[in-house]
């Protein structure tokens, strides 16, 4: 259970709002190239403003050392355009001028403080051992100590960063109630429903290059009997093909180069345990000197070219399985979709997902980008705003932000 914007009277209250508006930026002009995440959090910002709250937005852009690590001035302008409301950029984060700007706010006013990653403590957190990074420890960081006295509530709407434990994401919860924003609320409701109470048949389609993450999801959803079947593609499929005894030549070297050799043994165990619930391609599209050449997969014949997509017979097989599914969760592209010669598998997978009889969920990251490219994003029931956060949630992992939201509910529930 989590606290939401509707649980408290927010008029006249100063609310810190953490969002994820990390966006692609033209490094030459500073222009924002894709405002998807900015649009996603607009409902939360507007709701808070209309409730009469003084809205202080905290956000990050890229990280130190990257070419797109910059101020949030362009983000404030874009937010103003999207909201049709003035969003004032404050050229500071914890300095006196930033604190004075907060004190001078009127009800309903919106300001955006500077990039939180300008503070070293925000990028030095040990994300891998987050359970040791308690709110108490993060509450002792400079940013939290400087800013928390100005806030009555902390709203977290940064689902895309929910698997992180930086001060700006969890530190304020030690001092004030931590609430879900609209994006966070929708993500948690949708993904929890998919994991705990899906309509059946429930089919997961897992692909992409981050095979270890996808295999963790596969294991979790089969172990907990969430999924009735899992369709594999991309590097994930190649690992399961090797586990089944297929000889895929240079593609095995790719698996090794990516550090996924250990995943083959895991795949063998999963095949032994779940059998036909794990579906692998029956043909593949090979990259033969830049051309697409389709070939059926045969246990007795070695593949000698890179596999860059699933073949048409696999597309048909997956379409047949997906058309009657009542819940479909897809994460990761089916192949090298950036190359138009190998886009077809991903496009057909997305079409089959959109045309299924049930509720469709697309994980964030590359597959959501592909859905935009082929014009199918609008046909999905839910496209997650979080790539890594979404897949870790589906894998059954504890996410720092979600844990803190749950603890805040227990501490402050009405």
UniProtKB/Swiss-Prot annotation:
Give the pathway listed in the UniProt entry for this protein: Carbohydrate degradation; glycolysis; pyruvate from D-glyceraldehyde 3-phosphate: step 2/5
Q: What is this protein called?
A: Phosphoglycerate kinase
* Catalysed reaction equations from the record: (2R)-3-phosphoglycerate + ATP = (2R)-3-phospho-glyceroyl phosphate + ADP
* Subunit structure of this chain's protein: Monomer.
Q: Which UniProt keywords apply?
A: ATP-binding, Cytoplasm, Glycolysis, Kinase, Nucleotide-binding, Transferase
**Any one of the GO CC terms:** cytosol
* Localization terms from the record: Cytoplasm
EC number(s) per UniProt?
A: 2.7.2.3
Give the family from UniProt. Answer: Belongs to the phosphoglycerate kinase family.
EC main class here is transferase
UniProt superkingdom? Archaea
One Gene Ontology term of the molecular function aspect: phosphoglycerate kinase activity
Q: Which GO terms describe its biological process?
A: gluconeogenesis; glycolytic process
| Binding site residues for substrate | 20-22, 37, 60-63, 117, 164
Instruction: Please tell me where ATP binds in this chain.
Output: 338, 364-367
């Amino acid at each position: 259970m989590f606290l939401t914007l509707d649980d408290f009277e927010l008029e006249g209250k100063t609310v810190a709002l953490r969002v994820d508006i990390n966006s692609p930026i033209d490094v030459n002009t500073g222009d924002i190239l894709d405002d998807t995440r900015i649009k996603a959090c607009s409902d939360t910002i507007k709701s808070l403003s209309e409730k009469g709250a003084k809205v202080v937005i905290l956000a990050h852009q890229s990280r130190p050392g990257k070419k797109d690590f910059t101020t949030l001035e362009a983000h404030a302008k874009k937010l103003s355009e999207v909201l049709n409301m003035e969003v004032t950029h404050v050229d500071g984060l914890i300095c006196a001028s930033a604190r004075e700007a907060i004190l001078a706010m009127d009800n309903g006013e919106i300001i955006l403080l500077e990039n939180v990653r300008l503070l070293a403590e925000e990028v030095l957190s040990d994300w891998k051992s987050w359970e040791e990074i308690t709110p108490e420890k993060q509450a002792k960081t400079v940013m939290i100590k400087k800013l928390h006295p100005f806030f009555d509530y902390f709203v977290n709407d940064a689902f895309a960063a929910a698997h992180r434990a930086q001060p700006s994401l969890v530190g304020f919860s030690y001092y004030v109630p931590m609430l879900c924003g609209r994006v966070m609320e929708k993500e948690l409701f949708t993904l929890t429903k998919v994991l705990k109470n899906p309509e059946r048949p429930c089919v997961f389609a897992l692909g992409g290059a981050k095979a270890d993450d996808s295999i963790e999801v596969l294991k979790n959803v089969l172990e907990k009997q969430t999924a009735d079947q899992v369709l594999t593609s991309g590097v994930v499929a190649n690992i399961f093909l090797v586990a089944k005894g297929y000889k895929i030549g240079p593609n095995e070297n790719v698996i090794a180069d990516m550090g996924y050799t250990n995943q083959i043994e895991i795949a063998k165990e999963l095949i032994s345990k779940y059998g036909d619930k794990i579906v692998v391609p029956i043909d593949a599209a090979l990259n033969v000197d830049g051309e697409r050449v389709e070939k059926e997969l045969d246990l007795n014949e070695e593949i000698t070219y890179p596999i860059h997509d699933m073949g048409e017979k696999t597309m048909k097989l997956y379409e047949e399985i997906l058309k009657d599914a009542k819940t479909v969760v897809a994460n990761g592209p089916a192949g090298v979709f950036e190359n138009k010669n190998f886009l077809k598998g991903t496009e057909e997978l997305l079409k089959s997902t959109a045309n299924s009889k049930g509720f469709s969920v697309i994980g964030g990251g590359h597959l959501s980008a592909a859905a935009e490219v082929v014009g199918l994003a609008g046909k999905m029931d839910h496209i997650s705003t979080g790539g890594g956060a979404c897949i870790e949630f589906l894998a059954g992992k504890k996410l720092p932000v979600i844990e803190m939201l749950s603890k805040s509910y227990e501490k402050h529930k009405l």
